[in-house]
């Protein structure tokens, strides 16, 4: 969200965790971005996307970092292996007719770069797709530590 806002994008940051949204807002403030156009939404992403579809809102770019596991306000259970496909189908419906990109990350074992790439390929079809591992590199170690995976689709 912050990188997109810093680049001039109008952003909508959605997270089901009130604490995470508060932390992200504080991070925006610490980085001098408190006056940038960012909508901070505490909500279940699938419920939010469903409302945005009904409102006719469309987005040119989506950055999606779903949790492996979570619980909603009403005790609803979110497990990425059961919910991600629905989330991606809703994402497709809110993307504009001329989308710029979709960036998807995962920190869930088994969700390899190829898995993410295949999910996006099925969803969006034509476009440039690439994927990889997120790595933590240490100054004092020659070893990289994997911290997740990513896939990016762009027109």
Each PLM stretch: what is its role?
Residues 16-63:
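S-adenosyl-L-methionine
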Residues 15, 24, 42-44, 63-66, ...:
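Active-site proximal loops enriched in glycine and acidic residues that flank catalytic Cys/His/Asp
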Residues 99-155:
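C-terminal catalytic and target-recognition region of SAM-dependent MTase-like enzymes
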Residues 1-11:
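Conserved SAM-binding loop of SAM-dependent methyltransferases across substrates and taxa
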Residues 10, 37-39, 128-130:
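Conserved beta-strand segments of alpha/beta enzyme cores
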Residues 19, 42, 60-90:
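Mobile active-site "lid"/loop adjacent to the S-adenosyl-L-methionine
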Residues 95-97:
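Helix-to-beta-strand junctions that scaffold the AdoMet/dcAdoMet cofactor pocket
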Residues 50-53, 73-75, 114-115:
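Short, well-ordered secondary-structure micro-motifs
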């Amino acid at each position: 969200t912050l990188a997109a806002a810093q680049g001039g994008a109008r952003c909508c940051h959605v997270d089901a965790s009130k604490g995470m949204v508060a932390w992200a807002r504080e991070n925006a403030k610490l980085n001098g971005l408190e006056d940038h156009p960012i909508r901070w939404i505490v909500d279940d992403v699938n419920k939010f996307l469903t409302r945005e579809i009904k409102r006719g809102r469309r987005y040119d770019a989506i950055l999606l970092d779903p949790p492996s596991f979570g619980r909603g306000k009403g005790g609803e259970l979110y497990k990425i292996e059961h919910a991600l496909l629905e989330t991606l189908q809703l994402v497709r419906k809110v993307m504009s007719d001329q989308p710029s990109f979709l960036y998807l990350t995962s920190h869930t074992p088994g969700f390899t770069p190829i898995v993410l790439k295949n999910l996006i390929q099925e969803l969006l079809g034509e476009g440039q797709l690439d994927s990889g591992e997120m790595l933590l590199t240490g100054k004092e170690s020659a070893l990289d530590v994997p911290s997740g995976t990513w896939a990016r689709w762009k027109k």
